[in-house]
Amino acid sequence: ACIVVGGGNTFHLVAELHRYGLMEAISKVAKNGTPYIGWSAGSNIACPTLCTTNDMPIVQPASFNTLNLIPFQINPHYLDPQPEIDKMIKHGGETRQDRINEYLAVNQNMKVVGLREASAIWVVGDKYILKGGKKMVVFKYGAEPIELEPNADVTSFVI
């Protein structure tokens, strides 16, 4: 048996999980050894909070706290800054990296993983391994982002 949580709007998912008392139940079962698989919104809720989602806040959840299965935040579907495209669509908006840096400015002890498409973080015991064919980016307050190769043990970078 395992727990599988897919995508959708993270705010809505978190609101419903809190509403039905499932956040605590899922967290407890997963922390007791039941495998957890999450992608998109499902990866966001594995984090301590939903604060690094890309979703619109279409509802107000009871709390931004999520499952806290991992000690860092994930930004799924991470897109690298592309200055030419960003210039064309820049309407006072921000890149993903800008948003992550804003988050880190007020959450200075947290790390954020920019997880690109078709990538996953496989947790085995206390080790975190990047799976898939693309690099991931680790953001930490006051430091340059670090890119890590697929199939690497990324534990020391995210803990």
Predicted regions: what is each one?
Residues 2-8, 12, 25:
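Hydrophobic alpha-helical segments and helix pairs
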Residues 17-24, 58:
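Charged helix-capping and loop-helix junction motifs
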Residues 4-7, 29-49:
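Catalytic nucleophile loop
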Residues 10-11, 43-46, 120-122:
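Short, active-site-adjacent cap segments at secondary-structure transitions
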Residues 2, 50-52, 56-159:
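C-terminal and late-domain segments of enzyme folds
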Residues 10-20, 85-86:
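Glycine/threonine-rich flexible loop motifs
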